Amino acid sequence: MGDDANAKLFRERAGWWRNLFNSKTGYIQPRNADGSWKKVDFNIENDDDYVEGSGAQYLWMVPFDPAGLFEKLGGVEKATARMDRFFYGRDGSLAVTKAGYDHAELANEPSIASPWLYDFAGAPWHSRFSTPVVRCRTIVRS
C-alpha cells in the first residue's frame, strides 16, 4: 500500500515466468545456466526437472499473470480449450487427481489454484463446477 517502488519490482518479477516458457513446446521448461533449454528433446512425460509436478502442471502456475499466459497460448479461446484438456479426461470426466502427468493434480501445489484460471478466461462456470469435485476428492475430512 503506497510502496510504488516495491510494487513495480514485484510486478516485473512476476513476469519472469516468461523466461521459462518455451513457445516451441508450449510448456514451462527449465533452462541451463547459459539460457539454453535444459532438454532439447523435451518430453512432457519426463518430470525429472520439476518438483512435485510436470511441465503440463507447472504451465498453469501463473496466477499473477493469466492474461499474459493466455496470450502466450494463442489467446483466451485456445487457452480455455487447453485447460479443458488439462482438467477433463477423454471420457469427459474431471481429471483432477491421479490422472497422469498431462492432467491436473489438485492435491499438489503446482496445480492447486489452476481451476480459478477459468474465471480470468471468462468461463467461471468451469471453476464453480470443478471446485466441489476437487474438494470431495482431495481434501481429507477430519
Question: How would you label these PLM feature ranges?
Answer:
Residues 1-142:
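Active-site core of glycosidic bond-cleaving carbohydrate-active enzymes
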